[in-house]
Amino acid sequence: MGLELFLDLVSQPSRAVYIFAKKNGIPLELRTVDLVKGQHKSKEFLQINSLGKLPTLKDGDFILTESSAILIYLSCKYQTPDHWYPSDLQARARVHEYLGWHADCIRGTFGIPLWVQVLGPLIGVQVPEEKVERNRTAMDQALQWLEDKFLGDRPFLAGQQVTLADLMALEELMQPVALGYELFEGRPRLAAWRGRVEAFLGAELCQEAHSIILSILEQAAKKTLPTPSPEAYQAMLLRIARIP
């Protein structure tokens, strides 16, 4: 059996790995795990990834459970074009520098609007307004750092070409954008960066990867989202409670 990728395109890192694999012609058997239904908390999936998170890559008996590690693994295994994960030591270090900061300051912060506008209401929970405002402030600060520290006057986050850093960042920022947040308004450098990354990836691939998240508000309004399992419901309550 070939490589298996367990994913849900509602998930930002799942989309990053999906886009990377598609763009580079990497053969993967896709296994959809519905996050809203709570399939990532099922006994079957927990036997594959005890952390109960997506994406997860299975290469025979070898299992990887973190998106950045999966991207690096695929890049090296399939010898994708060097710009993604540069062989030059300093250029590669820049990619790792961003990915480390991304895990601390981007990942999680930009996912909170989905909990506020879709997932919380789905289970009858409203996130307190003071938490919503704190999250807006945190996103604004992170965008400023992203623009000033990592983008600067370069075309891409880690240099002159698209890298894994750009892909991870774009997918995280797409989450609130899909929910109506004007993240790029008043930020022409970031807006131009987004345009360059999407142009490189191609409109068709971006639309394919983003179609589910772009339609999730409409699904919520029409009440067509699936009902979470009891296990997922409890996990969702805990996640909402942890919003700072």
From Swiss-Prot:
Expressed in which tissues: Expressed at low levels in liver. In lung, expressed at low levels in ciliated bronchiolar cells, alveolar macrophages and alveolar type II cells.
Superkingdom per UniProt: Eukaryota
Gene name tied to this protein: GSTT2B
GO biological process, one term: glutathione metabolic process
Organism: Homo sapiens (Human)
Domain GST N-terminal: 2-82
Amino acids binding glutathione: H40, K41, K53, L54, E66, S67, D104, C105, I106, R107
InterPro entries: Glutathione-S-Trfase_C-like, Glutathione-S-Trfase_C_sf, Glutathione_S-Trfase_N, GST_C, GST_C_Theta, GST_N_Theta, GST_Theta, Thioredoxin-like_sf
PROSITE patterns, per the entry: GST_CTER, GST_NTER
Chief location bin: cytoplasm
Subunit structure: Homodimer.
CDD domains, sorted: GST_C_Theta, GST_N_Theta
Compartments it resides in: Cytoplasm, Cytosol
Gene Ontology terms for molecular function: glutathione transferase activity
Functional note: Conjugation of reduced glutathione to a wide number of exogenous and endogenous hydrophobic electrophiles. Has a sulfatase activity.
Protein name, entry field: Glutathione S-transferase theta-2B
Enzyme class: transferase
